[in-house]
Amino acid sequence: MIAASDLKAGMTFEQDGKLIKVMEASHHKPGKGNTVMRMKLKDVRTGSTTDTTMRPDEKVKKAHIDTKPVQYLYSQDDMAIFMDLETYEQYEVPTALIEEELKYLLENMEVKIQFYGEEVIGLTLPTTVILRVAETQPSIKGATVTGSGKPATMETGLVVNVPDFVEADELLEINTAEGTYLKRAK
């Protein structure tokens, strides 16, 4: 059991037979009354999200999540296929379960797959990935004053705001947690 005050973003717990992932968590002290935990929670199995509050001393059962290193092979018919790097066993994961993560995946990329018992519940991406710019607006000379950047579509379909000097076919390092441009890849 774990206290609600100890829950952090990314942790998973069990509640009423559901597997719940904490997306955001913060302490909130209203003008009157006791401190509460404000949280954005996601049901791992259904994908539905809810905003809720809990007392800091409320207890929840922490879920035991195992991870295995796998290699992303390909996607086909609403399934993403991964191969275990140790046993070469293949796992089929519904693309609806990993919809956001798919925007960062290239074939043969190594990631970690998350298990709850025998059930696949998600992926852990590396903190950064290197993706090629598939399409972006051409650079305009002298347009460096604004600094607002421009949208660029990456080879996986991910759209990232990039600086004006970035052009198509360049390799960029992307932060997977926030989906933001970090730098040009070497």
From Swiss-Prot:
InterPro entries attached to this UniProt entry: Elong-fact-P_C (IPR015365), NA-bd_OB-fold (IPR012340), Rib_uL2_dom2 (IPR014722), Transl_elong_fac_P/YeiP (IPR020599), Transl_elong_KOW-like (IPR013185), Transl_elong_P/YeiP_cen (IPR001059), Transl_elong_P/YeiP_CS (IPR013852), Transl_elongation_fac_P (IPR011768)
GO process annotations (BP): peptide biosynthetic process
GO molecular function: translation elongation factor activity
GO CC field: cytoplasm
Record SMART domains: EFP, Elong-fact-P_C
Keywords (A to Z) from UniProt: Cytoplasm, Elongation factor, Protein biosynthesis
Record's subcellular location: Cytoplasm
Top-level taxonomic group: Bacteria
Pathway the protein acts in: Protein biosynthesis; polypeptide chain elongation
Annotated PROSITE patterns: EFP
Keyword Ribonucleoprotein (UniProt): no
Pfam families: EFP, EFP_N, Elong-fact-P_C
Function of the protein: Involved in peptide bond synthesis. Stimulates efficient translation and peptide-bond synthesis on native or reconstituted 70S ribosomes in vitro. Probably functions indirectly by altering the affinity of the ribosome for aminoacyl-tRNA, thus increasing their reactivity as acceptors for peptidyl transferase.
UniProt-listed NCBIfam families: efp (TIGR00038), PRK00529.1 (NF001810)
Family listed: Belongs to the elongation factor P family.
Entry-linked PANTHER family: ELONGATION FACTOR P (PTHR30053), ELONGATION FACTOR P (EF-P) FAMILY PROTEIN (PTHR30053:SF12)
Name of the protein this chain belongs to: Elongation factor P
Organism placement in taxonomy: Bacteria, Bacillati, Bacillota, Bacilli, Lactobacillales
UniProt gene name: efp
